[in-house]
């Protein structure tokens, strides 16, 4: 079996196909239909759940799907410069880690949300958002919090670690990759713990092992 080193670089870009749904099948199916449809409903969607449930994976995967279709996408997270204006060319707005937004980012998120869903002129655009808590419990201004709960709301669940390790071990064995306990602990401690991201990382490790074998 192929041995792998710990110097594995960055995890690959998430995809919807790479997300292992588990108890999150309804949310995944919703996002598949949402991102693949040419006429997306402007009804907002909000994903919530604990760290490692796959919220950012799904948002980034949905964004990648939209970009591949030639869409323009507005993306807001804690690294976005405050007061970034809404862009009329956007086809969708994605808001990640909303529970971390400070006052200025909340102002920006509210501005983007209103301009997307209820524009003064032109077509409405969908909003996809994610956070740690259900909408009613978010530490946000009330007008933003209530809007995030307007539409489709999905709670995401994390796989138990024992199941996660078992799935990764089976997937590694199927690829002929020897995944030692040391590497397993490193991966689970260093990278996003949602299973979709981890499975894609395993593909990355497999390619890395092949490259180092050839070197």
Model-derived regions: residue spans:
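Dynamic helix-loop-helix/coil hinge segments at AAA+ ATPase domain boundaries and subdomain interfaces
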Residues: 6-28
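Walker A/P-loop nucleotide-binding motif
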Residues: 40-59
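Post-Walker A helix-loop "phosphate-sensing" segment adjacent to the P-loop in P-loop NTPases
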Residues: 64-76
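Conserved nucleotide-sensing/catalytic segment adjacent to the nucleotide-binding pocket
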Residues: 85-130
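Short regulatory helix/loop adjacent to the ATP-binding pocket of P-loop NTPases
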Residues: 135-149
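Conserved AAA+ ATPase "SRH/arginine-finger" region at the nucleotide-binding site
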Residues: 151-163
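Conserved small helical "lid"/interfacial subdomain of P-loop NTPases
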Residues: 160-180
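C-terminal helical "lid" of AAA+/P-loop NTPase domains
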Residues: 185-189, 196-210
């Amino acid at each position: 079996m192929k041995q792998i080193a710990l110097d594995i670089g960055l995890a690959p870009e998430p995809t919807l196909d790479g997300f292992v749904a588990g108890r999150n099948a309804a949310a995944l199916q919703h996002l598949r239909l949402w991102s693949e449809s040419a006429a997306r409903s402007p009804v907002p969607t909000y994903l919530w759940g604990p760290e490692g449930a796959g919220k950012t994976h799904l948002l980034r995967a949905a964004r990648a799907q939209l970009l591949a279709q030639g869409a323009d996408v507005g993306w807001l997270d804690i690294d976005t410069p405050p007061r970034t204006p809404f862009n009329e060319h956007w086809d969708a707005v994605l808001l990640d880690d909303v529970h971390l937004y400070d006052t200025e980012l909340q102002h920006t998120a509210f501005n983007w949300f209103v301009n997307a869903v209820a524009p003064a002129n032109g077509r409405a655009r969908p909003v996809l958002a994610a956070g740690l808590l259900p909408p009613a419990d978010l530490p946000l201004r009330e007008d933003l919090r209530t809007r995030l709960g307007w539409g489709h709301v999905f709670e995401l669940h994390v796989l138990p670690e024992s199941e996660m390790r078992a799935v990764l071990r089976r997937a590694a064995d199927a690829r002929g990759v020897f995944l030692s306990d040391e590497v397993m602990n490193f991966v689970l401690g260093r990278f996003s713990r949602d299973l979709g991201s981890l499975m894609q990382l395993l593909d990355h490790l497999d390619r890395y092992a092949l490259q180092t074998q050839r070197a």
